[in-house]
């Protein structure tokens, strides 16, 4: 049996992706390998298939217990003899699993790196004949990486202590050139064959949204994607708990995951999400590598993470099945303060802090750049950039760009006038013409450009400064309170040798509302009744087998069944993702559903919140016109959005919406409640 036979027999695929076959053949030829492949590119198959074909056992060192559990369940379900040892497995049971591996009953053994501490266990492990040691999430070994784990530093000494050195292979989804070099040195892979498939994930669309009511956006988005699995990442435990509470109050089946919960609570939350008992997981970065769920359709970052490495890894939890998925980052300047606090209050040495600030600045620039988001990420990881992707939020807004050279020159001259000694807040205040105590004390009211942008909002000026940093016209120098300095690119503009194009001041405000409406439209993809019937059968089988539904078949495989409608076992075996083992086990059950056909197509209902919101806008605008006041003086758009979502039935409930005081409740409360409920209460 060769690699292609194993691929079809156990995994149900006819062909390999990209460089999978090259990686596998290199391993089988007896050469060490280091592979940097994006999440969803099929890294696991690259070591699982050789493990099946090599004569002795394979140990896979993996960082998170929950990931081991999911992978072993999936392999066992496919008929592959696998097991794991970690802190959840009793000591005697761990030793027994080593005995089973020694006897050839187990081909793949997943192991936590903490198990490599010298002990009787490692003594027993050294007596087990091994063909290969696999280091998964290998970036964890690098002190320059975003997820450094000291336990990974023990791997090389463990391998060196074995009576006979096995093949050593290392896999990761994200690694900058610096981290890649550190991985080679720390794992003893200087002579390894290196495979870089490119980190691009074409099925993912990226979006950055600034300002607005982030909580409301998430509530509406999740509600309009209620049948799809998603992850919402927050920067703090408190934010996780608050978002979880709001989603639960809104009737959304959500789970939460952070380090402040007990092991049992986290395990239960993980299982509920994996088994589709909850559709949304709200989590800190403690929940990331520990999820192997293939059908996550969206990942939303409620707050900006600490680095692009973290962001791309967390966003990469979406669309592992290859189907389209969305990655949305909701950015606010306050997020920078949170991450700065984490860096300043950590126990890292100064050099590590410096690296952390560099990574944080790159993350901020991603949020502020006006260029293609996909290309920005690829360039950061040392990849060659391509044509703009055409479907990230920046590419979609490209037509809104205009010539802004005059404004850029004004800003660059201000930076020079201030002798490149101040940060964005001071520069923006000077341009705005703010006569603050600080500016007076620093004698900055006499700067030639003082007040030249007095007609612009202060926030818009700061946003422009950040965009110029992200696009390479300015750079930050010093931490934690950086000053802004000109780059050669900005100096060319001042010399009249280059023009600057970007968004007009405040243009993002207008586009933000349009983007929200677009994002809140429910998906209209053709998910007919047959697909839903197949999903229901999968859910039933998963409950019978006590495994997550995606372990039975992925969404992509069910969609292929619904599309191709096989009528025989032979035709079912040709469906992408249906292997021989699963065909024999489940084929007839799924064929029965396909032959019977679907009852009726599933039709998405129209979003009632959007209709009510329009009615509330009309009522608010009518009141404003009658009283001769600005609309926001009556109720802000954000307050109306919360009314449409929470639907208060009384004046008391209306008063709970943020920013609505007793006077407004008394004056307009009855009108608002009647607009929402009519004569029903």
Feature locations, PLM:
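Helicase motor core with emphasis on the C-terminal RecA-like subdomain
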Residues: 2-10, 14, 18, 22-44, ...
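Gly/serine-rich nucleotide phosphate-binding loop at the start of the catalytic core
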Residues: 59-60, 246
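C-terminal accessory regions
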Residues: 359-384, 536, 543-545, 618
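Short flexible coil/turn linkers enriched for glycine and charged/polar residues
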Residues: 198-200, 321, 371, 566, ...
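The −1 position to Zn-ligating cysteines in a subset of zinc-ribbon hairpins
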Residues: 326, 376, 391
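Short alpha-helical segment immediately N-terminal to, or the first helix within
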Residues: 26, 301, 366, 560-561, ...
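Accessory DNA-binding and partner-docking regions appended to nucleic-acid-acting proteins
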Residues: 1-3, 356-357, 386-681
């Amino acid at each position: 049996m060769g690699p292609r036979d194993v691929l079809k027999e156990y995994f149900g695929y006819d062909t390999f992706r990209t460089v999978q076959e090259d990686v596998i053949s290199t391993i089988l030829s007896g050469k060490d390998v280091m592979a940097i492949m994006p999440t969803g590119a099929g890294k696991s198959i690259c070591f699982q298939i050789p493990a099946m074909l090599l004569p002795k056992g394979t140990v896979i060192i993996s960082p998170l217990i929950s990931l081991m559990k999911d992978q072993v369940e999936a392999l066992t379900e496919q008929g592959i003899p696998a097991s794991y040892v970690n802190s959840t497995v009793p000591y005697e049971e761990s030793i027994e699993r080593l005995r089973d591996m020694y006897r050839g009953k187990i081909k793949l053994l997943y192991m936590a790196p903490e198990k490599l501490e010298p002990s009787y266990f490692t003594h027993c492990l050294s007596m087990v004949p091994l063909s290969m040691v696999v280091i998964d999430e290998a970036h964890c070994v690098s002190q320059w990486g975003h997820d450094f784990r000291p336990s990974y530093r023990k791997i090389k000494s463990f391998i060196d202590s074995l009576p006979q050195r096995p093949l050593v292979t290392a896999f990761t989804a994200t690694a900058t050139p610096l981290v890649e070099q550190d991985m080679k040195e720390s794992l003893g892979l200087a002579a390894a064959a290196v495979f870089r498939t490119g980190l691009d994930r074409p099925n993912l669309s990226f979006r950055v949204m600034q300002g607005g009511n982030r909580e409301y956006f998430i509530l509406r988005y999740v509600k309009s994607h209620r049948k799809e699995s998603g992850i919402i990442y927050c920067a703090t435990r408190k934010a996780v708990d608050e978002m979880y509470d709001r989603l639960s109050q809104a009737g959304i089946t959500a789970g939460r995951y952070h380090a402040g919960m007990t092991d049992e609570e986290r395990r239960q939350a993980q299982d509920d999400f994996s088994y589709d008992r909850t559709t949304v997981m709200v989590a800190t970065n403690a929940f990331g590598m520990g999820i192997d769920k293939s059908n996550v359709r969206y990942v939303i970052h409620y707050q900006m993470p600490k680095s692009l490495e973290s962001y791309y890894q967390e966003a990469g939890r979406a669309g592992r099945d290859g189907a389209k998925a969305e990655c949305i980052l909701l950015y606010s300047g306050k997020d920078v303060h949170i991450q700065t606090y984490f860096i300043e209050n950590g126990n890292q040495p100064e050099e590590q802090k410096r690296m952390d600030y560099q990574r944080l600045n790159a993350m901020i620039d991603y949020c502020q750049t006006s260029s293609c988001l996909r290309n920005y990420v690829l360039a950061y990881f040392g990849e060659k950039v391509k044509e703009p992707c055409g479907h990230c939020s920046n590419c979609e807004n490209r037509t809104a760009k205009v010539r802004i050279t005059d404004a850029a020159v004004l800003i660059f001259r201000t930076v020079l006038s201030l002798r490149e000694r101040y940060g964005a807040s001071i520069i923006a205040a000077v341009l705005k013409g703010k006569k603050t105590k600080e500016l007076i004390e620093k004698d900055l009211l006499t700067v030639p450009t003082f007040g030249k942008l007095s007609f612009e909002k202060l926030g818009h000026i700061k946003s422009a400064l950040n965009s110029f940093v992200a696009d390479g016209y300015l750079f930050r120098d010093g931490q934690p309170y950086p000053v802004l300095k000109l780059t050669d690119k900005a100096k060319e503009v001042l010399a009249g040798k280059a023009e600057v194009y970007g968004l007009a001041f405040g243009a993002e405000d207008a586009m933000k509302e349009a983007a929200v409406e677009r994002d809140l439209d429910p998906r209209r993809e053709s998910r007919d009744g047959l697909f839903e019937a197949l999903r229901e059968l999968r859910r039933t089988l998963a409950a019978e087998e006590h495994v997550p539904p995606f372990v039975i078949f992925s969404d992509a495989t069910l969609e292929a069944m619904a599309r191709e409608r096989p009528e025989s076992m032979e035709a079912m075996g040709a469906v992408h993702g249906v292997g021989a083992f699963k065909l024999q086990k489940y084929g007839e059950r799924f064929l029965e559903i396909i032959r019977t056909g679907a009852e009726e197509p599933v039709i998405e209902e129209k979003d009632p919140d959007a209709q009510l919101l329009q009615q509330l806008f009309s009522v608010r605008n009518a009141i404003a016109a009658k009283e001769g006041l600005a609309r926001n003086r009556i109720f802000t758009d954000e307050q109306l959005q919360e009314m449409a979502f929470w639907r208060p039935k009384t004046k008391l409930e209306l008063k709970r919406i943020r920013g609505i005081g007793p006077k407004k409740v008394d004056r307009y409360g009855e009108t608002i409640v009647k607009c929402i409920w009519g004569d029903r209460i």
